[in-house]
Amino acid sequence: MGQQLLRRFKGYGCSMIGACRVVAYAEDVVVILNSPLGCAHILRDRELERNYQATNAMRGMFNSIGRRIVYTNLTNDDCIYGSGKKLAAAIGLVVELYNPAYILVVNSCMVGIIGDDIEAVAAEAEAACKVPVLAINSFGFMNGAYSNGFKLAVSIILSRFCTIQEKQDDTIVIIAPFEGKHSAAFRTVKQYLCFLGMKKVILFPGAASLEEIKLLCTCRYGIIIDHNNMLATDYEAAAEVLHERLGIQILDYADPAGFKETLSWLGKIHTALQSPESSYKMLREQLKQQYSQIINDFLAVAGKGNTVSIVIRDAKVILNFTWLNELLDDLQIEVEGIYIDRDNAMANGNVLDTLLYDVPRLSSIERFYLTVEEISLRLDGKN
């Protein structure tokens, strides 16, 4: 299991979820699910809502109502008479309540079965409301799964809002499944790129505003990051579309793991972007100082030659742990035990498999499957 099988479990869900993912963290769009209540529950309350709420603390929005996702609540009668009237009413209500930059109508398999002309409804509503309305005929599983909806939404959005323009050397797009602009991963990469001379860093698919989407055609370069994510194949497909449609040059390097690989990765980016040598050297020096400070701070607390424990609990994603080899060497410490929360054994077990694959020296370390409370007592020396 773990990292080696990760891509096997890429998005085989409904294509509606894939289409919605393209704008999952965008602030200025409203998604209308033209679907029955069941589809809306899965999409709104379980998938996108969960991901968005996870970022609220970073956004300072602890009481946020979440993403602006509405649904038409299609019924059996709508199977007979069509969904057009409900959808038109929903579009009008969304414009009145939210005043979005644009609206994304994501259609369910029910709409595909009855054959509604959703493009015509969207065009008529757009003319009346003066707001762009894009219809995504994802149709659930009728025309494929998650990946198909994702690619379709990317293609339609680019076709509608992007035209070939003069390239700007200081505008770049990040093509990565980061959890929005407020995620630590995006903020870190953006900081590096701005240091190298980028003035506009766009995260697409996923979080770009309409203004940023229109700027995609000015990007000379795009960077693919996070190849180990289960959505990596979908984002690589999006990169191909960006290259073919807009002529964006895609920089696709192996994800860095650890300090030395990060410096090497930044060197490749620096060379490709032809950024100022002085800026690159200054960034390298700053990162070296930060890493040295981390090492010194840890040794000041733990001391050289001491042992540490690794605790795996409440795992949500499978990570790349190869950086741990470098850190253990630089700290000159040994791992005395690996503690796994047994109440979440399956997910934590997948993470453990990846950890042992990436850091072979840990294969012989004793493992303890305990509750969180038992782990705390053991590490506190109380049991």
Model-derived regions: residue spans:
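An N-terminal assembly and electron-transfer interface module characteristic of large anaerobic redox
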Residues: 1-383
